[in-house]
Amino acid sequence: MTQWEVVIGLETHAQLSTVSKIFSGAPTQFGAEPNTQACPVDLALPGVLPVLNRGAVERAIRFGLAIGSTIAPRSIFARKNYFYPDLPKGYQISQYEIPVVQGGQITIQVPANEKAGKPAYEKTVNLTRAHLEEDAGKSLHEDFAGMTGIDLNRAGTPLLEIVTEPEMRSAAEAVAYAKSLHALVVWLGICDGNMQEGSFRCDANVSVRPVGQEKFGTRAEIKNLNSFRFLEEAINYEVRRQIELIEDGGEVVQETRLYDPDKRETRSMRSKEDAHDYRYFPDPDLMPLVIGQDWIERVQAGMPELPAAMQQRFVEQYGVSAYDAGVLTSSKAMAAYFEAVVAKAGAANAKIAANWLMGDVSSQLNRDGIEIDAIPVSAAQLALVLQRIADGTISNKIAKEIFSAIWDEKATDEAAADRIIDAKGLKQISDTGALEAIIDEVLAANAKSVEEFRAGKEKAFNALIGQAMKATKGKANPQQVNELLKKKLG
């Protein structure tokens, strides 16, 4: 029986976060009324000329520097010729032979697949190129009985098309790459990453070949996948479709396909064109893009600390594990919040801060469906909660209660934790005499558990601790309760 190898390459369109379009001064705001953000250049009216947006170029340079690519000192804009109703010029301005970003790498972390018995692993994906181009408009098929409406607000919006080598071998690798790329462009501030609005979307080129064969199989391109789940589902379906087709004696044809998320299947859209079908040629209205070393150095000077470097720093500076550092640097906002908490709580509390961010904080964020930059608990407020755990004022259990109270009331005072502790009488009981009296009562009331413990049943000890904590409404110092119980039980 033939064993098949999957071959995947991704082309990702990241909408660059410029205020105006790539070749005109029209705004790029999402959600405006149709055709209210299109100027004569976007409409391709006679006599108008494109003017390149410097901000788009700088964002492309920033991306290239982040992935270790070569920034082309001289690159060319080309006309990609094809007809579509929402492309007024009859061509798209893109880059072909000489893109602005050449090469580069992105390292991905592929999660374990327990069902398949595959462990987690790291992989480096090589990039072919990243080039600047303009987006097309949008065809609107609803609300127009028997007709199609055209909205040109999106026409001319700057895109960075990022192309990988065909090096991914599973949907899991493709999704891991897409997530890493998404996190990077958002981290760099070059794209808002809003997949629902189409700011970040992927085209997947998928083929299969017998294991050991060097020649690639015939590929199908699945267009405009705007969620990581759709990307995974579309690739998995397409792989199954191609294998079944070949094993049944058929042939895979080179074509463009769309993914139907309701049916969870891909369907044919059109035959897939080759580059020569687009009749690329240099755009005579645009001069070659010349990028000097001084320009690159200016962009380099404004680069943020990159996730990989920050992850390593967190391990060395704060003593957190590599895994924890990876989670904490999954977004710039999360990393900034963590460092702000540690700055207030002290470096000695860095590990507990990391645990809280990955535990209670993340849980509450997921519950409310918000991101870390919208968290209602300030870094200073959380830091004080952690300090009160560290100095023995409250237990970890009470700390969770206080954190939830600050969150729910959206408190604005920095000392909210102390206010709530005093108002509700939540200070931890650490007085040895008071705790001994409570423990004596617990032992007297739970003679059976005492006998079971002395007979060697360790679970009975935990039950006694639970009773002591219950008697103090969770306010007893757990460590002291543990020590006093052991002492009294001999």
Swiss-Prot record:
It holds the Pfam family GatB_Yqey. GO terms for biological process: glutaminyl-tRNAGln biosynthesis via transamidation; translation. Keywords: ATP-binding, Ligase, Nucleotide-binding, Protein biosynthesis. Disulfide bonds: none annotated. Signal peptide: none annotated. Coiled coil: none annotated. GO terms for molecular function: asparaginyl-tRNA synthase (glutamine-hydrolyzing) activity; ATP binding; glutaminyl-tRNA synthase (glutamine-hydrolyzing) activity. Its EC number is 6.3.5.-. It catalyses: L-glutamyl-tRNA(Gln) + L-glutamine + ATP + H2O = L-glutaminyl-tRNA(Gln) + L-glutamate + ADP + phosphate + H(+); L-aspartyl-tRNA(Asn) + L-glutamine + ATP + H2O = L-asparaginyl-tRNA(Asn) + L-glutamate + ADP + phosphate + 2 H(+). SMART domains: GatB_Yqey. Belongs to the GatB/GatE family. GatB subfamily. Heterotrimer of A, B and C subunits. Allows the formation of correctly charged Asn-tRNA(Asn) or Gln-tRNA(Gln) through the transamidation of misacylated Asp-tRNA(Asn) or Glu-tRNA(Gln) in organisms which lack either or both of asparaginyl-tRNA or glutaminyl-tRNA synthetases. The reaction takes place in the presence of glutamine and ATP through an activated phospho-Asp-tRNA(Asn) or phospho-Glu-tRNA(Gln). This is Aspartyl/glutamyl-tRNA(Asn/Gln) amidotransferase subunit B. It comes from Burkholderia ambifaria (strain MC40-6). The lineage of its organism: Bacteria, Pseudomonadati, Pseudomonadota, Betaproteobacteria, Burkholderiales.
